[in-house]
A protein has these predicted regions:
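Glycine-rich, phosphate-binding/catalytic loops in enzymes
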Residues: 71-74, 140-142
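Secreted/periplasmic proteins that engage bacterial cell-wall peptidoglycan
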Residues: 47-72
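Structural recognition of the beta-strand scaffold that forms the well-ordered cores
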Residues: 54, 74-76, 121
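Non-catalytic cell-wall polysaccharide-engagement segments
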Residues: 2-37, 41-45, 63, 80-157
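A mature extracytoplasmic/lumenal domain signature
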Residues: 56, 70, 78-81, 126
Length: 157
């Protein structure tokens, strides 16, 4: 009996850890309006809306008025670096949630086209050094992908 217990105890422990780590996350604090915008541009650019929502949670905690080091709004867009993109997309107010997410999704789509690997795309978006040559997933990318998966589960995907 003890041999059987010793054999199955590690398996039971691993299963309990696995099921505990996949428990439902707390509700997203992203507003319904922002979620709808993420769905709109997710569909337009072929990007998972939950990925956009996870990025917004990480970049700005869902606050459209945030500014950090010249990066602004929900997706922390630099109007200095994305001036041409903003003009092309007709975005005049980078703090406007629709315009900010539009610019962010357009930039992400460009990065996906160039790099294809979501880990590299997120690292480049985040401005990490040597992002194109990294072989390991950055902490930023890992957080975004984990949260995106949680949001997908919350949305029944």
């Amino acid at each position: 009996m003890r041999k059987i217990l010793k054999l199955f105890l590690p398996i039971i422990m691993c299963l309990s850890i696995t099921f505990t780590s996949t428990a439902q996350p707390k509700d997203s604090f992203i507003s319904e309006e922002v979620q709808e915008i993420c769905v709109k541009y997710g569909e337009e650019y072929g990007i998972c809306p939950e990925l956009l929502m996870a990025m917004i949670e990480k970049e700005s905690s869902g606050r459209p008025d945030v500014e950090n080091g010249g990066c602004k709004g929900l997706m922390q867009i630099s109007d200095r670096w994305h001036k041409d993109r903003m003009k092309r997309l007709g975005v005049t107010d980078i703090y406007d949630p629709d315009g900010n997410i539009h610019v962010g999704a357009d930039y992400l789509a460009e990065l996906f086209e160039k790099y294809e690997d979501v880990g590299i795309v997120l690292a480049v978006y985040h401005g990490e050094r040597n992002a194109e040559t990294k072989t390991e997933l950055s902490d930023y990318a890992d957080w975004i992908l984990t949260r995106s998966a949680e949001l997908e589960r919350m949305n029944g995907k």
